[in-house]
Amino acid sequence: MDIEKVNSMDFGEFVDVFGNVIERCPLIAAAVWSKRPFSGLGDLEKHFFAFIDGLPLSGQEGVLRCHPELAGRQLPWGRLTAESQREQSAAGLQNLGAAERLRFTELTAQYRTRFGFPFVLALRLSDPAAAPRELARRLRCPPAQELRTALGEVKKICHLRLANLLGEQP
Amino acid sequence: MDIEKVNSMDFGEFVDVFGNVIERCPLIAAAVWSKRPFSGLGDLEKHFFAFIDGLPLSGQEGVLRCHPELAGRQLPWGRLTAESQREQSAAGLQNLGAAERLRFTELTAQYRTRFGFPFVLALRLSDPAAAPRELARRLRCPPAQELRTALGEVKKICHLRLANLLGEQP
């Protein structure tokens, strides 16, 4: 899909196609449509990022809370969005052994309690084996810093999903 | 459900229950969770309304664009959220005659083109027969005024859905 095609979309098509580049936040794609025309992938994603950066703190936390728990029990596989399911499958998180999975689940619960949002990680950019280590590291970060880190992961995921939709190299 | 139950919810439960009181905008419920505890229905809805009012123009348009077209062909029935389907059914819009439906569809298309968002109406507060007349009237309003009117309808729908969930009289 080239950028002329994107610029020709009405808001219904645009939200259908881009509504989940920020997980479960079609509102953001629907808002970004106001900023068309777009000159390319970089310009398009700039508007997604600017919208997130312009949200109040509660809204930024809200974006994170729309993400599924990684390898979590709360969101059964069937309820993951297609994008998340592909990304989690590719990362091999469903292949964690029972003990590793239990430990990972304990740490994600601690993370959720500490920060008030789920652990978000751009899995396609990570070594699967590194996810538990990264989780343990981020669990110890100060909340304001961790919010910035987590939103950075949301933006990486957004970039990858947009590049995928536009058929470009990330 | 009483307000103590609401205040005891973790963000996952809260978004599951309240994620669609603003149509297809779980981000807003996820943000409102940051404002707990809530003293009651009025306090809870105040935070939903304040979040919408605090959005930039593109975000307010985005909220509207997440709503389905009334009696529309773009969103087939199966894709409506459960809440929208109930509200549209109750309003009898699916019972429009062929000619009325065609006329209604033409006007909603004009509305969409003029304002860049779909026609939103709190159907449960309207006489079904009045919807086409109200659409024709609002189609002639200045865009800034119509945005305010449409967001007012979003808030009425939010109020009705919240009252329904809390088991209170709207």
From Swiss-Prot, chains A, B:
Pfam families: OHCU_decarbox. The active site is at H67. It catalyses: 5-hydroxy-2-oxo-4-ureido-2,5-dihydro-1H-imidazole-5-carboxylate + H(+) = (S)-allantoin + CO2. InterPro entries: OHCU_decarboxylase, OHCU_decarboxylase-1, OHCU_decarboxylase_sf. GO terms for biological process: allantoin metabolic process; purine nucleobase metabolic process; urate catabolic process. Keywords: Decarboxylase, Lyase, Peroxisome, Purine metabolism. It is an enzyme of class 4 (lyase). GO terms for molecular function: 2-oxo-4-hydroxy-4-carboxy-5-ureidoimidazoline decarboxylase activity. GO terms for cellular component: peroxisome. The keyword Endoplasmic reticulum does not apply. Its EC number is 4.1.1.97. Substrate binds at P68, S84, Q85, R86, E87, Q88, F119, V120, L121, A122, L123. The keyword Lyase applies. It is found in: Peroxisome. Belongs to the OHCU decarboxylase family. Catalyzes the stereoselective decarboxylation of 2-oxo-4-hydroxy-4-carboxy-5-ureidoimidazoline (OHCU) to (S)-allantoin. This is 2-oxo-4-hydroxy-4-carboxy-5-ureidoimidazoline decarboxylase. It comes from Bos taurus.
